[in-house]
């Protein structure tokens, strides 16, 4: 992998990785629908397929009614859900999520965590960084860090007992 060119690395990231950023990183000049379509465009998917996939993902995260809204017209929780839909656009094999429910209401957070659990059961590796014990309870394995070092690592039940 160290021998790959930047373009090749970008292709791997686009096709195999999904990123849910705590700060969303949505394009401010693009609508919710267009933001979710971006990774599909870079993957070379036809426009109609991009639109259909983006609409389906936005519906899945409860945002079908806000397709044409810009990020500035969305609440923090709505922006978070658009960012989650975008991260799932290319069916990543590895999903990296930084506080994916941090800006969501409790019920919406539970729905998103259930969705991430289902993706994991279907074969997607999901890595979540969180300070929220309720979110970590959805996991199968828990790594605890302190001062940048792993202080415990194991199945969720064992790691919870070590806390």
Residue ranges and their predicted role:
Residues 1-145:
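ABC family nucleotide-binding domain
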Residues 149-163:
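Conserved beta-strand-loop-alpha-helix hinge in the C-terminal portion
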């Amino acid at each position: 992998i160290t021998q790959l060119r930047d373009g090749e690395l970008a292709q791997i990231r686009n096709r195999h990785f999904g990123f849910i950023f705590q700060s969303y990183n949505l394009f401010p000049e693009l609508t919710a629908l267009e933001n979710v379509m971006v990774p599909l465009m870079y993957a070379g998917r036809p426009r109609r397929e991009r639109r259909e996939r983006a609409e389906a993902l936005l519906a899945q995260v409860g945002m079908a009614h806000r397709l044409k809204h810009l990020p500035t017209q969305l609440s923090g929780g709505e922006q978070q859900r658009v960012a989650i839909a975008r991260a799932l656009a290319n069916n990543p094999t590895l999903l990296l999520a930084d506080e994916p429910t941090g800006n969501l209401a409790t019920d919406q957070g539970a729905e998103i965590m259930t969705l991430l659990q289902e993706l994991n059961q279907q074969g997607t590796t999901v890595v979540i960084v969180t300070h929220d014990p309720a979110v970590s309870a959805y996991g199968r394995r828990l790594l605890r860090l302190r001062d940048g070092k792993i202080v415990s690592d194991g199945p969720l039940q064992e790691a919870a007992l070590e806390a």
